């Protein structure tokens, strides 16, 4: 039933021609369901069924608009679709309808352009240009002024490509959200491409739509901004970015643009953004691209004033676009931006380098050859440094730490020669493309090769990786980073005010944060300036702390027992390392780093093989020799063996006996929750067993990431990369067969970490985790969501769907049971299958992140033991042991990342106050916000837990 919102019963209209009159009659009868009541002279009367509403249309060629005038007016109004609220353009008539969603679908079928508020999924009002040139609106509201409009959720039909978006039940829409700031936001990729840019574009587009704003993409970087028009500044719909997550490069294009460096080019860009109605611009690129973006914002007031003075924009446009809001995301494989730990694409490029060197290792070892590997990095040696750490390279050349023209040859030959003398068959030297001597002379790969051949007589080859480093899909970390930063960038644009400087979205350890864009770019550029000025100490000081820490670690590990130890003999210790729990990527890296760092310091490293069971039953203790662990950094699993038994489950007294026999001064445990429990048992037994009165550190290593005291565990990244590749392949199969969804069962115990992040990086339609369980109501909503999604994407490519289920989310609803339920309840709209990756999730070769973090954590653990030995030494054999002394308690700790810091936390505090022992979980988890974002970006509604 249709009526007028303000309560009046009659609507009077004027048609300027017979054609427009007939169009109006067809509109009100065929679309709105009115019927022709009568015709008198030039008047036509239409009414609804109970005659409570009358529409009178008069044919008047003088006062009404002709067909051409109607078309011109329609074109003029539609041009302002993304710029102006149509309600402000003219007096509008608003009709009340019972089913607004159905009317929207009907109007769309008849090719009417609609302006919908607040958005297409939850429409309150919809406006279109009627057949005789009037703006007409429709609503489900009973009153013209209402504080709580009735929200009807859209259910898309086949062929109706809608801007699907949804919000989790925990963040359901309310009246406050409808008052939020809405801005038209454009995203642009610029400069060199990097893996993860597509994930960033997808996140920006969908987060923008989710917040009720309009999303745009600037094609071809700044070149597209200068050229402008709908071809280069294109409105993006929800479905336009499907499949972006698994694709490398940038699908919206990038180009270097000299025109934008000139003011006239930026003036054209300003005009084009205003024409498109853009309020905010998110730029993903390197320091040059971000510098241009900030300059653009700085000049914006003068640019828009110039356009107004020239008459190229109206006063209304000038007032509407007085301010441009800009936010930066760093897309660069060099990872050379200051004030952020990682850039989008950096770890993907590092993965390509490490994978290539892993392959090269095999042939180098076979022929006892040396390989010189050239990697990218003109002014930043991050790729070369991290690759050197992750692959145990013999030598690296980076621009931040040059040597004199002769010194580098002597240093390299000295280290490589000693490695060869120790029995190493292969040699890997990594050269950053920007490597230089202290007098700024470039060091080329050919020069390095010649030195290795002439001075050491090594059969040497050169491998230049080139653009292979940019290619391929993004790794799990870069997909996560790009997605979270894209969502944060949209929030930043919506929250910015004219007096707030442009932000740069950064990451600090494990936390997404905002930094001043101008300051970050300034520091980044000053590094290159310092190098050019030969001020290498300043250049190194401008790098972040983690870079300097990694460089110091590499130099220490690289010398190992080949140089004089750095500690005096009286301070050298015996330090043991043991693996507990299931194998995880990075365990071997931790053993390698611990052993080599101990050797460089003068300590004696020991490996306890096969866990505490191996120690108590077989006395499986062995000192570590350098040549025995050569290459372990790149090997998956656990070379020293591992099992799940804790000290109390084996024989804690026998373990104490062997600790005393070997006179261990420190212990490093690498493992998951069993390792956590083991450390607690050892710490609790100190009063009874003096041999446990030594510093002890746990390095969390488990794919479940369920160890209290840390937000990241070794092995989790390797697991996510393996699972990501698996999901991409399964999704490809689902897309190829059309109308297919796969339920993928993943590990993780009682932790939903793996399922949550796998859902985020694969674009899964839903994920089920133990923390929430699976309710029938949620299943029903997810099935309906899948039906809607398949309806919208009917006939489209890249339309395969995934559902991620953690094994312990439900013991009753197994993957096969879930698949049967989905197939039965979907009424044939799609087909559901299962896929179970099993132990494939543990991964093969550890990822570069797990390798480098394993090294970093192990060295920090050794340093912790060095720092705390003196605390326990006075009490080693005292009968009255102060077990509750805080200093004593702090000598048994978990090393972890929490928020944005690397920290040691007492095992006693964690065990007593932050652990759910029965569930083998920490009491608080940090990835709930990740779940919300993952659901938002696929349009899933998640119910609150009761």
Swiss-Prot record:
Beta-D-fructose 2,6-bisphosphate 2 binds at residues 644, 702-706, 747-749, 839-842, 920. Mg(2+) binds at residue 287. Residues 1-559 are annotated as: N-terminal catalytic PFK domain 1. The keyword tRNA processing does not apply. Residues 574-946 are annotated as: C-terminal regulatory PFK domain 2. Pathway: Carbohydrate degradation; glycolysis; D-glyceraldehyde 3-phosphate and glycerone phosphate from D-glucose: step 3/4. Beta-D-fructose 6-phosphate 1 binds at residues 369, 461. This is ATP-dependent 6-phosphofructokinase subunit beta. The lineage of its organism: Eukaryota, Fungi, Dikarya, Ascomycota, Saccharomycotina.
């Amino acid at each position: 039933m249709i009526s007028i919102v303000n309560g009046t019963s009659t609507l009077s209209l004027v048609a300027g021609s017979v054609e427009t009159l007939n169009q109006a009659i067809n509109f009100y009868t065929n679309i709105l369901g009115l019927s022709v009541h009568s015709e008198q002279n030039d008047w036509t009367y239409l009414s609804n069924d109970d005659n409570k509403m009358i529409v009178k249309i008069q044919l008047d060629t003088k006062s009404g608009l002709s067909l051409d005038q109607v078309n011109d007016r329609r074109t003029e109004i539609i041009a302002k679709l993304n710029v102006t609220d149509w309600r402000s353009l003219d007096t509008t008539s608003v009709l009340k309808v019972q089913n607004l969603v159905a009317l929207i679908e009907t109007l769309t079928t008849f090719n009417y352009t609609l302006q919908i508020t607040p958005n297409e999924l939850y429409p309150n009002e919809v406006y279109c240009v009627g057949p005789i040139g009037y703006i007409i609106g429709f609503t489900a509201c009973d009153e013209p002024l209402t504080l709580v409009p009735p929200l009807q959720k859209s259910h898309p039909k086949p062929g109706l490509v809608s801007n699907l978006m949804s919000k989790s039940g925990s963040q359901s829409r309310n009246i406050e959200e409808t008052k939020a700031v809405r801005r038209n936001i454009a995203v642009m990729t610029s400069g060199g491409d990097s893996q993860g840019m597509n994930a960033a574009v997808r996140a920006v587009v969908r987060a923008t739509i989710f917040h009720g704003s309009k999303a745009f993409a600037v094609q071809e970087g700044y070149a597209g901004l200068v050229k402008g028009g709908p071809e280069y500044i294109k409105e993006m719909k929800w479905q336009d970015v499907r499949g972006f997550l698994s694709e490398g490069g940038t699908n919206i294009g990038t180009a270097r643009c000299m025109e934008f460096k000139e003011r006239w080019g930026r003036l054209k860009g300003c005009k084009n953004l205003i024409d498109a109605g853009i309020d905010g611009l998110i730029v993903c690129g390197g320091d040059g691209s971000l510098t241009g973006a900030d300059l653009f914002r700085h000049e914006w007031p003068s640019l828009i004033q110039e356009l107004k003075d020239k008459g190229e924009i109206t006063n209304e446009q000038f007032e509407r676009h007085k301010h441009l809001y800009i936010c930066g995301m760093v897309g660069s494989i060099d990872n050379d931006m200051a004030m952020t730990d990682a850039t989008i694409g950096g770890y993907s490029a590092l993965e390509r380098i490490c994978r290539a060197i892993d392959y090269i290792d095999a042939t180098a070892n076979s022929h006892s050859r040396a390989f010189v590997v050239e990697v990218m990095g003109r002014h930043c040696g991050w790729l070369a440094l991290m690759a050197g750490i992750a692959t145990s390279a013999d030598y690296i050349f980076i621009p931040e730490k040059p040597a004199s023209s002769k010194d580098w040859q002597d240093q390299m030959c000295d280290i490589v020669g000693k490695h060869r003398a120790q029995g190493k068959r292969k040699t890997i030297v990594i050269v950053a493309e920007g490597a230089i001597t202290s007098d700024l002379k470039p060091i080329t790969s050919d020069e390095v090769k010649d030195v290795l051949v002439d001075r050491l007589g090594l059969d040497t080859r050169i491998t230049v990786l080139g653009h292979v480093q940019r290619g391929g899909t993004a790794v799990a970390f870069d997909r996560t980073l790009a997605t979270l930063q894209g969502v944060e960038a949209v929030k930043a644009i919506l929250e910015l005010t004219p007096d707030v400087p442009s932000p740069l979205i950064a990451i600090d350890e494990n936390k997404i944060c905002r930094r001043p864009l101008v300051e970050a770019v300034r520091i980044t550029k000053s590094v290159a300036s310092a190098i050019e000025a030969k001020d290498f100490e300043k250049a190194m000081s401008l790098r972040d702390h983690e870079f300097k820490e990694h460089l110091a670690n590499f130099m220490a590990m690289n010398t190992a027992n080949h140089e004089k130890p750095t500690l005096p003999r009286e301070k050298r210790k015996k330090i043991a390392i043991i693996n507990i729990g299931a194998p995880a990527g990075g365990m071997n890296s931790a053993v390698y780093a611990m052993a080599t760092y101990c050797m460089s310091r003068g300590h004696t490293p020991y490996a306890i093989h096969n866990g505490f069971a191996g120690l108590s039953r077989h006395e499986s203790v062995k000192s570590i020799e350098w040549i025995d662990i050569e290459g372990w950094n790149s090997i998956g699993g656990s070379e020293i063996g591992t099992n799940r038994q804790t000290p109390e489950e084996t024989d804690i007294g026998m373990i104490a006996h062997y600790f005393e026999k070997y006179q261990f001064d420190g212990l490093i445990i690498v493992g998951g929750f069993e390792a956590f429990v083991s450390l607690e048992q050892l710490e609790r037994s100190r009063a009874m067993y003096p041999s446990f009165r030594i510093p002890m550190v746990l390095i969390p290593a488990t794919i479940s990431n369920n160890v209290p005291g840390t937000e990241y565990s070794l092995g989790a990244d390797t697991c996510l990369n393996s699972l990501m590749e698996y999901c991409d392949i399964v999704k490809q199969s689902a897309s190829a067969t059309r109308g297919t969804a796969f339920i993928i069962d993943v590990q993780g115990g009682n932790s939903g970490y793996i399922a949550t992040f796998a859902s985020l990086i694969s674009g899964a339609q839903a994920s089920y985790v133990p923390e929430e369980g699976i309710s029938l109501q949620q299943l029903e909503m997810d099935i309906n969501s899948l039906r809607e999604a398949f309806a919208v994407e009917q006939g489209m490519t890249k339309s395969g769907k995934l559902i991620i289920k953690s094994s312990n989310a439900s013991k009753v609803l197994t993957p096969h049971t879930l698949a049967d339920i989905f197939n039965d309840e979907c009424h044939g709209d799609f087909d559901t299958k299962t896929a179970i990756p099993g132990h494939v999730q543990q991964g093969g070769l550890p990822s570069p992140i797990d390798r480098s973090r394993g090294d970093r954590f192990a060295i920090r653990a050794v340093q912790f033991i060095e720092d705390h030995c003196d605390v326990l030494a006075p009490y080693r054999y005292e009968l009255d042991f102060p077990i509750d002394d805080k200093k004593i308690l702090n000598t048994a700790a978990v090393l972890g990342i929490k928020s944005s810091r690397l920290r040691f936390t007492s095992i006693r505090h964690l065990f007593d106050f932050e652990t759910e022992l029965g569930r083998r979980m920490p009491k608080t988890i940090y990835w709930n916000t990740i779940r919300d974002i993952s659901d938002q970006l696929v349009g899933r509604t998640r119910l609150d837990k009761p």
